[in-house]
From Swiss-Prot:
GO terms for cellular component: bacterial-type flagellum basal body, distal rod, L ring; cell outer membrane. A lipid is attached at C19 (S-diacylglycerol cysteine). The basal body constitutes a major portion of the flagellar organelle and consists of four rings (L,P,S, and M) mounted on a central rod. The keyword Signal applies. This is Flagellar L-ring protein. It comes from Pseudomonas aeruginosa (strain ATCC 15692 / DSM 22644 / CIP 104116 / JCM 14847 / LMG 12228 / 1C / PRS 101 / PAO1).
Length: 231
């Protein structure tokens, strides 16, 4: 019995351990810096003022609009959510059956052991009651900045940007990743844009090391918080 219990606990620990998300790794190719697809031609030392390939429109600014350009995204994320659910289910039932006659004859007879007459009658009842109450709340805030590169320019002029930032601390690494779509008109003159202006944003803030491990519940805690716990 003890051996079976140990094997069962090891199986549960293994299953719950497999449900843990693997820690992020640096140098993800998807978030690697994107270089310009067409390199600028080499400048010619011919003494001319105009150099082919280096021209710029008189009304252009220095805002990013090409593949490989750099944009700084200011993180201003704040979310708050709450959820509450109540349920109450109750069911009562009662049934009574009695036969007083059969083919015109009475169904009561003298009880041979005393205590009154006997009759073919039955009565039963039942009651069920189930109640549930759940409440969840979550609040997140993320501020800071991250510099990314333009990965693609869509036909309508929308910029697809992505990038990551790794910070190595004494006790581990901190990671910020972001990817999304930016409208060129939302970019300020200093090549910055708020994260609230990034469409289809994918923002990841994670880390590795002692602090990240301390915030993760143990395998036994995950079992009690998982749907496998029957109570």
């Amino acid at each position: 019995m003890n051996r079976l219990m140990i094997v069962s606990l090891l199986g549960i620990a293994t299953a719950l351990g497999g449900c843990v998300n693997p820690p992020p790794k640096p140098n993800d190719p998807y978030y690697a810096p994107v270089l310009p697809r067409t390199p600028l031609p080499a400048a010619q030392n011919n003494g001319a003022i105009y150099q082919a390939g280096f021209e710029q429109n008189l009304y252009d600014d220095r805002k990013a609009f090409r593949v490989g350009d750099i944009i700084t995204i200011t993180l201003n994320e704040k979310t708050q959510a709450s959820k509450k659910a109540n349920s109450d289910i109750q069911k009562d039932s009662k049934t009574k059956m009695g036969l007083t006659s059969l083919f015109g004859s009475g169904m009561t007879t003298n009880n041979p052991i005393g205590g009154g007459d006997l009759s073919l009658s039955a009565e039963y009842g039942g009651s069920r009651d189930a109640k549930g109450d759940s409440q969840a709340g979550q609040s997140n805030s993320l501020t800071g900045s991250i510099t990314v590169t333009v990965a693609e320019v869509l036909p309508n002029g929308i910029l697809s940007v992505r990038g990551e930032k790794w910070m190595t601390l004494n006790t581990g690494n901190e990671l910020v990743r972001i990817a999304g779509l930016v409208r060129a008109d939302d970019i300020a003159t200093d090549n910055t844009v708020s994260s609230t202006r990034v469409a289809d944003a994918r923002i990841t803030y994670s880390g590795t090391g002692a602090f990240a491990d301390a915030s993760q519940p143990g395998w036994l805690d995950r079992f009690f918080l998982s749907p496998l716990w029957p109570f």
